[in-house]
Amino acid sequence: EHLSLNQEGQLNMIDLNIRALTHLARHYGAEMKKKGSGRILNVASIAGYQPGPKMAVYCATKAYVLSYTRALHSELKKSGVSVTALCPGFVETGFQEVAGMELGALELSGAVPADRVAKTAVKAMRKGRREVIPGLFNKPIPYANRLVPISLNLAVVKRLMS
């Protein structure tokens, strides 16, 4: 639960996912705009499309990344600079096995290999796309979230994170 998590860790996540990302995108976005070209890739998450019990700050920061990226993409569209949000779901990195984590949720969720996520992200960024969701299983999630009641959405996410 959010209230039992280490507050310093949660604030560090906010600093990284919001403050640092905003600072870097603003700084390098301005430089790219002066040159008349450039690409920015921000790492959001499929979690940015929904609230997440047991990972409230993570989901909230990724929602910020997604919203910020969409807005910046729109602002810079005619300047030759594109901004892309990468919104992966679970990613197979090998970390889970090393950390001794259960893989049940990952296996059921259609986890995507890290190299495929990276290739998909670079391809979308080069094309100037606003956002990209790697993996067939993940693509319908934002649309499904709009169709189901928030209470059901929250229950499903809570169950997946248990």
Feature map (PLM): residue ranges:
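Active-site Tyr-X3-Lys motif and surrounding loop/helix of classical short-chain dehydrogenase/reductase
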Residues: 1-4, 8-15
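Active-site helix of classical SDR
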Residues: 25, 61
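Residue(s) in the substrate-gating loop at a strand-loop-helix junction
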Residues: 45
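Active-site loop immediately N-terminal to the catalytic Tyr-X3-Lys motif
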Residues: 52-56
